[in-house]
Curated annotation (Swiss-Prot):
GO terms for cellular component: ribonucleoprotein complex; ribosome. It comes from the Bacteria. The keyword Ribosomal protein applies. It comes from Legionella pneumophila (strain Corby). InterPro entries: Ribosomal_uL5, Ribosomal_uL5_bac-type, Ribosomal_uL5_C, Ribosomal_uL5_CS, Ribosomal_uL5_dom_sf, Ribosomal_uL5_N. The gene is rplE. One of its GO terms (biological process) is translation. Part of the 50S ribosomal subunit; part of the 5S rRNA/L5/L18/L25 subcomplex. Contacts the 5S rRNA and the P site tRNA. Forms a bridge to the 30S subunit in the 70S ribosome. Transmembrane segments: none annotated. This is Large ribosomal subunit protein uL5. The lineage of its organism: Bacteria, Pseudomonadati, Pseudomonadota, Gammaproteobacteria, Legionellales. GO terms for molecular function: rRNA binding; structural constituent of ribosome; tRNA binding. The keyword Plastid does not apply.
């Protein structure tokens, strides 16, 4: 079993039940899924870029991504409906906890000038979104073999009803959120 999953079952559930006065263990919020999304606008001009993005995403997540296609044609961006413009991966269960563990303990400390994640990135219903500007901060990506620097979006979906519950859950997992007084 993943280290963070054991930690959640043993420590986080009891801490959250005390803090929010839940009557049942099933009321305690949990992380449902983590979605990684990489928009690859350069793939319009060069098809190899998409293949490199798929390789990077596979290395980062541990599973093959789904290629996202343009929903409609936009002349200003020079894209047509159905053209590949990105890729995404949805992580659940064991892989999700393993990815979160790597993200918190290895990847985020490697980000240049990192001072914590923005605590205002909650969406109001208990989900947290963040962006990574360079995919090379992940230890799985070899800097010498990469063709370019691309960013990706990470969305952590929880079963929490409010932002306060979701923030408490993610802080229990040691996700480094900034303090409100410190900017």
């Amino acid at each position: 079993m993943a280290r963070l999953k054991e930690f959640y079952k043993k420590d986080v559930v009891t801490m959250m039940m005390k803090r929010f006065n839940y009557s049942s263990v099933m009321e305690v919020p949990r992380i449902l899924k983590i979605t990684l999304n990489m928009g690859v606008g350069e793939a319009v001009g060069d098809k190899k870029v998409m293949n490199h993005a798929i390789e990077d995403m596979t290395l980062i997540s541990g599973q093959k991504p789904v290629v996202t296609k343009a929903r409609k044609s936009i002349a200003g961006f020079k894209i047509r409906e159905g053209w590949p413009i990105g890729c995404k991966v949805t992580l659940r269960r064991e892989r999700m906890y393993e990815f979160l563990d790597r993200l918190i303990s290895i990847t985020l400390p490697r980000v240049r000038d990192f001072r914590g994640l923005n605590p205002k990135s909650f969406d109001g219903t208990g989900n947290y979104s963040m962006g990574i500007h360079e995919q090379i901060v992940f230890p799985e990506i070899d800097y010498d073999k990469t063709d370019g620097i691309r960013g990706l979006d990470i969305c952590i979906t929880t079963s929490a009803k409010t932002n306060e519950e979701a923030k408490a859950l993610l802080e229990a997992f040691n996700l480094p959120l900034k303090d409100k007084d410190r900017k």
